[in-house]
Structures are given as C-alpha cells and as structure tokens.
C-alpha cells in the first residue's frame, strides 16, 4: 500500500522532521485559500497521485499567482494524470497539495528499503538528488552510500554521521541530517514501511536540511496492526482489476504482455511466467488463485484476466494436490462456459487424477487445449497468442 505525498509529509511532521507548510485541497477555491493561509508570494501546487514523474507530466507547478493556482486545480481535479510510471489511463487526481515555496541550494537523496540480501532495513543516501535512484544505481553506483540497520541495536547516530560526511555536509547540517535519519528509521519500524524515499532532500539557501518530497510504501501484510495507516488508503489509486481480485482473495498483478496466466500457488505462478518468457511470450499478469481452485474462483479469475484487452490467449497451470484434477477440469469448463471465453485456453494439469482431468478437457466441446507438460503448455499458449 502506498501513501500520497501529503500523507507522507504529515507523518514526517509528527516525527519532528522539517517539511514545508502545506494543505491538501479538494477544490480550486480551497487551493486558493490555502495559498492565502500559507502566505508569501510563491507557492508550489502538486497533483496528488501515487505515481512518480508528476513534474515532467505537468502535474507540478511553481507560481506566484493565485489565479494560476485556481486554473491548475480546475484543470487537474477529477482528471487522470499520466506519467512514465502509470499505464495509458493514468491515475485520478482527487487532491491538490499547495505548499510554500522553498529556495534550493542543493538536492540530495535519502531512502530506505527492506533489503532481502542482508535481511535488514538499508538506508541509502546520494548527492544525486532529484534524479531517479534507479538511474543513479545503473550509471554511477559509487555515488550511492548505504547504512545497514541492525534490528538488535536499531539505528545509530554514527551511521547518520557517516552518511553525512559522504554527502559533504557541514557540522550544522550534520546535526539536522542525524535528526532526520533517526526519525525516519523510527518511523520505518513503527509503521511497518517497505519503502521510504525523500527525493529530493534539499539544502535550502539558508543552509538547512529540508524534506521537499515524500514517498512511502507500507508492507501490506502488516496493515492489520496499522489502523491509522489503513485509514490513509486511497482505493482510487489502485488498479481496478487488482482491487476486484482482492475481493475474491485472488492475488493479481497486471503486466503488459498478451498471455494471461492463471495458476494456483505463488511460486508456481512465477515459474509459469518465467517459462512463458523463455518461449518468447509476454505474460499479461500474475494471478494466483490459491489452494482452492473452485469453479467460482476460476470464473472470477477468467473475468479479471479477460478484462485486459491485450490478452490473446490464457494459460491455466494447476497442480492438483488435495483437490483432484478431474474436479478442477470440470470447474475450468464450467467457468469458460459461464464467462464466454473467446480466446484460446491452454490448460496444464498435474497431480491427483491428472490423466482423468486432461481427458475431461479433451472431451469438452470448447476451445481448450490440454497440454502434456509445462513446456508444452508454454509453447502452445505462445503460439496461440501469436496467431491472434
């Protein structure tokens, strides 16, 4: 689960971190009034969506004219903002953040992630602020400095100072940076973050550290113990298909290929996507129907997969353990009839009564191809997708 910038900054403020005075506004009139309340003669107005790249897409404006603020809000509220991180539909803009303008002397980067390699929270800092960190990691990885947080001792001030020295901070800035570092580390643990980015973390003209942006991702598995964070969820930013799938306890992630995938088990689902890629195909989704591949769940899975107009063929890869493959085959046939599937469906069944399940599929009068192996299934579904 992701947070909006204004939500991230409200958390920053709670932990005593330096952020700009700002207000999240629902209407153009509120945006104008917010500028008046903030005061000054320059403001920054930003569309609030979860995707990055807002500035390049016209979703951020610096202005000294309140009527320009009104026009900006009227133009964007209720519309979708398309950036390089969204699909072609973009994400809806329901709020505009109005902030005081900050004079910037230098831009830095500060972020933290849960690192699988070290099994620790790892903080990353760089002098290359305002640039996508992925670009920095690829082109100049030596400019990214790291601090690994030991879960037994927690974050230590010396780690902040070490990063600060590498960023070239002055003694005064070092103290401010240490406060930011320690606050973010505590926040990361308190609220079960999975990702945290301040890009850019700026040094103002007065020489002070300031959090100019904020991006936060929460570990979805920990939301049960984060009631305050749950209330911040904005369902309008979620992929509609992913949200629909969650209602039926289906794990679905939309991708940009043309081969729909329906599998029981996350590991098998990832392996299925890999073998589709290996044979020249492009998966259109990740979809794990879970352990109970019932007719109802399979039918909903088909509906979700086929709501993507790019899907030209569907690969169903089911391992029958507790559930018999012949029962799964009957469920697939029933679901295909109910949904009215019009693209080729390749089914690979393995496990209990697999031969009987393949026989049931072969005897159906539907456009269902029973594969003999996972390799055969991948080859057939890629061929079917290419012929469409």
UniProtKB/Swiss-Prot annotation:
Coiled-coil annotated residue ranges, if any: none
Sorted UniProt keywords: ATP-binding, Ligase, Magnesium, Metal-binding, Nucleotide-binding, Tricarboxylic acid cycle
EC number: 6.2.1.5
Chain sites annotated for binding ATP: 46, 53-55, 99, 102, 107
GO CC annotations on file: cytosol; succinate-CoA ligase complex
One GO process term, biological-process aspect: tricarboxylic acid cycle
Biological or metabolic pathway of the protein: Carbohydrate metabolism; tricarboxylic acid cycle; succinate from succinyl-CoA (ligase route): step 1/1
Start and end residues of each ATP-grasp domain: 9-244
Domain of life: Bacteria
Known cofactor(s): Mg(2+)
InterPro entries noted in UniProt: ATP-grasp, ATP-grasp_succ-CoA_synth-type, ATP_grasp_subdomain_1, Succ-CoA_synthase_bsu_CS, SUCC_ACL_C, Succ_CoA_ligase-like_bsu, Succinyl-CoA_synth-like
GO MF, one example: ATP binding
Subunit structure: Heterotetramer of two alpha and two beta subunits.
Function recorded in the entry: Succinyl-CoA synthetase functions in the citric acid cycle (TCA), coupling the hydrolysis of succinyl-CoA to the synthesis of either ATP or GTP and thus represents the only step of substrate-level phosphorylation in the TCA. The beta subunit provides nucleotide specificity of the enzyme and binds the substrate succinate, while the binding sites for coenzyme A and phosphate are found in the alpha subunit.
Protein name: Succinate--CoA ligase [ADP-forming] subunit beta
Gene for this chain: sucC
